[in-house]
A protein has these predicted regions:
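N-terminal targeting signals for Sec/Tat export/insertion, comprising classic cleavable signal peptides
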Residues: 40-54
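C-terminal or internal capping secondary-structure element at the end of a domain, subdomain, or sheet
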Residues: 142-196
């Protein structure tokens, strides 16, 4: 009888463990940015082509990943502004393509605009487009990995901010594409923090 109670207790404990783990998995977002110990959901992505700068062989592509509280406003098919509140991350990537990201690992290098690098990147938390006074953290090192799953991107990043705090995350989904030629170098989200 004692063995039966122990067996039932073990089965009950194991069931609770499995249900608890499944619940934890269900509550974590599929796309997120993590700063220190705090996790923020990401739900939308933008890919902006700024073409080539100077003598660099690489195209300048900006990737902006945003939380669900933001709405992008367009004018004549180009980004005009952003409204709402939330969090996001921006990568300035040097790539061989102009309309998509290469499947590759991009390494942070603030001194270079070589293929396969990124620089001038930052994460923004608690941004309110009405007050434009976010908590902004410049990225000082790290890696961004780009993969494809069918027609959707899988971006993962593991970086440090200028204070040495970890900024990491994953984004799974599409990136809305905007093409800015030489005449539109100043285009993009006008009221988004810019560290360039």
């Amino acid at each position: 009888m004692k063995n039966l109670y122990q067996l039932l207790f073990c089965v009950f404990a194991f069931t609770l463990l499995i249900v608890g783990c499944k619940k934890d998995r269900d509550n974590s977002p599929g796309s997120y940015i993590k700063h220190g110990d705090v996790v923020y959901e990401l739900s939308q992505g933008i890919l902006e082509n700024y073409g080539k700068y100077g003598t660099s062989e690489a195209n300048n592509l900006d990737v902006i990943l945003l939380s669900p509280g933001f709405k992008i406003h367009e004018s004549n098919g180009q980004i005009d502004s952003i409204s709402g509140m939330g969090n996001g991350i921006h990568f300035e990537i040097h790539d061989s393509s102009f309309d998509k990201l290469d499947i590759d690992d991009y390494i942070y290098n603030n001194e270079s605009e070589q293929l396969g690098t990124f620089n001038h990147s930052s994460a923004v938390f608690n941004y309110d487009s009405r007050s434009e006074n976010p908590q902004e953290f410049e990225i000082s090192s790290g890696k961004l990995t780009v993969k494809m799953n069918g027609s959707e991107y899988e971006l993962s990043f593991d970086c440090l901010d200028s204070d040495g705090k970890i900024i990491s995350g994953v984004y799974k989904g599409s990136l809305k594409y905007y093409n800015y030629d030489d005449a539109l170098k100043s285009a993009g989200i006008k009221n988004w923090p810019d560290i360039r």
